[in-house]
A protein has these predicted regions:
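Domain-scale signature associated with acetyltransferase and cell-envelope carbohydrate enzymes
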Residues: 1-113, 137-138, 156, 172, ...
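Short acidic, glycine/proline-rich loop/turn micro-motifs
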Residues: 62-63, 121-125
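Beta-rich strand-turn-strand
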Residues: 88-96, 144-158, 164-168
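Glycine-rich NAD(P)-binding loop of Rossmann-like domains
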Residues: 124-136
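A short, glycine- and basic residue-enriched loop/turn
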Residues: 133-134, 151-152, 173
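Contiguous, function-dense segments enriched for cysteine-driven chemistry
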Residues: 116
Length: 203
C-alpha cells in the first residue's frame, strides 16, 4: 500500500512539472523517474533511452531536474543510455550542451555554457557574456555536486570526482578532481581490463 501511494505521489509531481514546463521543442521520450522542468525557446533532444531521476537516491521525492534551452538557437542533447541523477540542472544560453551516450551525472550536478552576465559591472545587465559549448564524451562518470562551466570538453571514459568544479577541458580516460579541477592519473584500456574480473569457466 505504501509503495503504491509513493508511486502516485511521484507520478503527480512529474505531471505537475510537465504542466509548468514551457519548452515546446522537446524531442524524444526520456524515462521520467523524477519531475523535470523543461524551460526555454531552444531545443532539448533525447536520443534513445535516457533516464532522468534515480531511486533510491537523495532528493528523489523533494527535488526536481531543471533543463533550460534559454535562447532559440540553444540545443541541449542527451545520448542513448545517459543517466541523470536527481536535482541536476543544465542551462544553455546559446552555444549548446551535449552529453555522450552512456554517460552518468550524479546528484545535484550543474552544467552551464555561459557566464550569463558580463564581468564588467557597467555592463552586467546588458553586456554580452562569455560563453562556449559544453561537450561531454561517451561513458563519462560525473560524481555528485559537480559543476561544469562554459566551453569545457570532457573526453570519453573519463571520471569527474564529487564536488569538482571543471573550468577547463579534460582529456579522455582521465580522472579529474578539485576546485578548480586538476587532471590525473590517466586510465588506459588495460586498466579497465584489470578491474573487470574474468568470467569463471563453465564445467
Amino acid at each position: 500500500m505504501k509503495s503504491r501511494l509513493l508511486w502516485w505521489y511521484q507520478k503527480l509531481r512529474v505531471i505537475k512539472y510537465r504542466l509548468l514546463s514551457d519548452c515546446e521543442r522537446v524531442y524524444g521520450k526520456p524515462v521520467l523517474r523524477q519531475p523535470v522542468h523543461f524551460v526555454g525557446q531552444g531545443e532539448i533532444r533525447f536520443n534513445g533511452k535516457v533516464n532522468l531521476g534515480v531511486y533510491p537516491s537523495p532528493f528523489f521525492f523533494n527535488g526536481y531536474i531543471y533543463i533550460e534551452a534559454r535562447t532559440p538557437d540553444a540545443v541541449i542533447e542527451f545520448g542513448d543510455g545517459v543517466f541523470v541523477n536527481n536535482s541536476c540542472f543544465l542551462i544553455s544560453d546559446g552555444p549548446g550542451i551535449s552529453i555522450g551516450k552512456g554517460s552518468m551525472l550524479g546528484v545535484n550536478c550543474e552544467i552551464i555554457d555561459s557566464d550569463f552576465h558580463d564581468t564588467n559591472p557597467q555592463r552586467r545587465l546588458n553586456g554580452v557574456p562569455r560563453s562556449g559549448k559544453v561537450v561531454i564524451g561517451e561513458n563519462v562518470l560525473i560524481g555528485s555536486n559537480v559543476k561544469i562551466l562554459k566551453g569545457v570538453r570532457i573526453g570519453k571514459d573519463s571520471i569527474i570526482a564529487n564536488g569538482t568544479v571543471v573550468t577547463k577541458s579534460v582529456p579522455e580516460n582521465m580522472l579529474a578532481f578539485g576546485n578548480p579541477a586538476k587532471c590525473g592519473p590517466r586510465f588506459s584500456p588495460q586498466d579497465w581490463k584489470q578491474r573487470v574480473p574474468a568470467a569463471e569457466p563453465q564445467p
